[in-house]
């Protein structure tokens, strides 16, 4: 039993730290004293001698896709830890807000592509809300080392420690260590709560789901954006467009594909009730747009240093790499029957040769990133350009060969792609697949999930997020009706499809579309104040509505503009919903 003297001393210590300045606490000595002691977390040993601490004053950001502009002070601290018996080192970095700005919040951040972190790119989105922000190198070597560089110990030998760390362990450990350090750093009592959040997009979105599925008791709120879940299918599907080109023996110019994309947008734009250059209803587009209508339409493009399609249309750095960029000559012509067939086949999704469905594709209006070709000056022809994310996944993760891409797609068929998907599921089902549908631990802990996905994402199909939402609903509410289970799940898990948005960013092909830049603020209000996001707040970042606010409908409701396009409402449209629902009969087991 504690004496009154010890209780008073503890209270005085807490009060003193909370009243301290950033300069007082942002020292190596104070950080070392705040680190979790050996034995705090089973199997982890923190190296106190590795700690660094540097105060930063009056830092500012002009804002980004996931946070607004702000000015703030913080303590930039780092340290390393190891796993007992592994002979490894993992580095972590945190920004701790100044003591007077700390709101007892913590935020873990993730990466993109094969990177487990995005550096400090997302940290401002934490400290401006009074939250510690953290990232990890995952024990891969350093903050710049990506998984694909270390996934193999040698040909035929998978680095399973790296797979498990990248898959879910490293972010979970980052969160636990960050919160434990914060308690001492800020002089908090052991039973004081730190609201714990995660935010990430693409690979960062997959990492977010890994935390919900594996560390449900640690988090109060998670924002998984455009997640690269269903990893086996997601990575291999990047090769699907290439295999369609190889199968048809047709390799279109970017200009020809660009024409089809622009015509799709033009036709489908007004289907939502407002003509604004944004395809808000890609489902209606699927129901009403006929790609054959583009046959024979003229196209013309000036020479460019790189392809006009792809990640140039979004402002964020690449998170899921497609084919390499290459210079393109001036091009003109008319849309060919071969191009129409190619586009329709891609949009239909991947089927086996005997007609079984294996995976969905992108929504109409999204750019055909994976179908980009390369131009050969000597032959004056466009040639196959194998999407590197998919190719490298096959060589390193499935074939276990230290090769950065497939040398060719000779003898690769649609069935080959499905076989690769099945093989990857068997190998990485418990680590990278990240589609466990039973979220009972997270739900029981009172956690909230705010998931979002751009409808015109051309790297990770938005149908992927819809399918996972429906998988969770079917497992968590097996005996409830669609409407009842959707309403019940909406109390803690909401999915928002962002009209016109590209991969984890706004879209210059549809510049008048909104983007949700304040998701963490929305989630904080939901978690801490009980303000349910019936719709998701967004902002028009460019175009004719720049600076205005927008609202995004929660799945399964879909946006429709009424009163001559002046008012938006969220409607239930069964025919549209049905376009998002798929039966994967190419697999013997359920594909969540």
Task: For every predicted segment, state its role.
Residues 15-104, 120-121, 288-407, 513-516, ...:
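Catalytic-loop region of hydrolases
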Residues 273-281, 303:
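Acidic, glycine-anchored loop motifs typical of Ca2+
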Residues 41, 187, 228, 274-277, ...:
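Intrinsically disordered or highly flexible coil/loop and linker segments, enriched in small
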Residues 228, 241, 270, 274, ...:
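Short, well-ordered loop/turn and helix-capping segments at boundaries between secondary-structure elements
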Residues 483, 489-509, 542-545:
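Histidine-bearing beta->alpha loop at or near hydrolase active sites
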Residues 1-21:
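Fungal secretory targeting signals
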Residues 79-274, 286-290, 373-448, 453-454, ...:
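Serine-hydrolase-like catalytic core of hydrolytic proteins
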Residues 164-167, 251-255, 328-331, 455-456, ...:
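Active-site rim elements
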């Amino acid at each position: 039993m504690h004496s009154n003297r010890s209780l008073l001393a503890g209270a005085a210590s807490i009060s003193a730290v909370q009243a301290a300045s950033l300069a007082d606490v942002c020292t190596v000595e104070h950080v070392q004293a705040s680190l979790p002691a050996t034995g705090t977390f089973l199997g982890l040993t923190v190296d106190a001698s590795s700690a660094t601490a540097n105060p930063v004053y009056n830092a500012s950001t002009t804002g980004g896709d996931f946070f607004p502009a702000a000015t703030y002070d913080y303590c930039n601290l780092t340290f390393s830890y190891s796993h007992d018996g592994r002979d490894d080192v993992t580095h972590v970095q945190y920004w701790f807000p100044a003591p007077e700005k700390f709101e007892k919040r913590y935020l873990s951040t993730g990466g993109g592509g094969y990177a487990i972190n995005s550096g400090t790119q997302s940290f401002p989105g934490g400290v401006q809300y009074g939250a510690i922000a953290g990232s990890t190198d995952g024990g891969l070597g350093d903050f710049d080392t990506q998984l694909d560089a270390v996934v193999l110990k040698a040909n035929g030998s998978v680095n399973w420690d790296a797979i498990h760390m990248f898959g879910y362990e490293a972010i979970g450990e980052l969160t636990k260590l960050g919160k434990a350090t914060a308690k001492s750093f800020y002089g908090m009592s052991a039973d004081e709560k730190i609201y714990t959040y995660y935010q990430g997009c693409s690979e960062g979105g997959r990492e977010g789901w890994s935390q919900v599925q594996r560390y449900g008791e640690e988090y109060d709120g998670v924002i998984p954006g455009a997640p690269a879940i269903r990893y086996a299918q997601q990575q291999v599907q990047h090769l699907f467009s290439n295999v369609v080109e190889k199968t048809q023996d047709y390799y279109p110019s970017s200009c020809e594909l660009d024409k089809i994309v622009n015509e799709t947008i033009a036709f489908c734009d007004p289907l939502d009730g407002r003509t604004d250059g944004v395809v808000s209803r890609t489902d209606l587009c699927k129901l009403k747009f006929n790609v054959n209508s583009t046959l024979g339409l003229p196209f013309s493009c000036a020479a460019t240093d790189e392809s006009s399609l792809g990640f140039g249309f979004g402002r964020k750095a690449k998170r899921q790499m497609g084919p390499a960029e290459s210079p393109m000559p001036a091009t003109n012509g008319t849309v060919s029957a071969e191009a129409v067939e190619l586009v329709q086949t891609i949009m239909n999704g991947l089927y086996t040769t005997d007609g079984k469905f294996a995976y969905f594709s992108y929504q109409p209006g999204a750019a055909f990133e994976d179908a980009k070709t390369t131009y050969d000056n000597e032959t004056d022809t466009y040639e196959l350009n194998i999407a590197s994310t998919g190719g490298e996944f096959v060589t390193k993760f499935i074939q276990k060969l230290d090769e950065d891409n497939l040398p060719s797609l000779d003898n690769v068929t649609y069935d080959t792609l499905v076989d690769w998907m099945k093989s990857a599921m068997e190998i990485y089902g418990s680590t990278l697949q990240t589609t466990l549908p039973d979220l009972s631990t997270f739900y029981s802990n009172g956690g909230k999930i705010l998931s979002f996905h751009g409808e015109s994402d051309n790297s990770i199909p938005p149908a992927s997020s819809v399918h996972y939402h429906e998988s969770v609903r079917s497992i968590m509410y097996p005996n409830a009706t669609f409407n009842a289970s959707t309403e019940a799940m909406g109390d803690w898990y909401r999915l928002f499809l962002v009209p016109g948005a590209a991969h984890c960013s706004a879209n210059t092909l549809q510049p008048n579309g909104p983007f949700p830049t304040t998701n963490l603020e929305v989630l904080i209000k939901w978690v801490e104040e009980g303000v349910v996001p019936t719709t998701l707040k967004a902002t028009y970042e460019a175009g004719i509505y720049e600076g205005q606010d927008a609202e995004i409908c929660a799945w399964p409701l879909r946006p429709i503009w009424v009163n001559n396009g002046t008012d938006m409402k969220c409607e239930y449209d069964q025919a549209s919903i049905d376009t998002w629902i798929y039966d994967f009969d190419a697999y013997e087991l359920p594909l969540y």
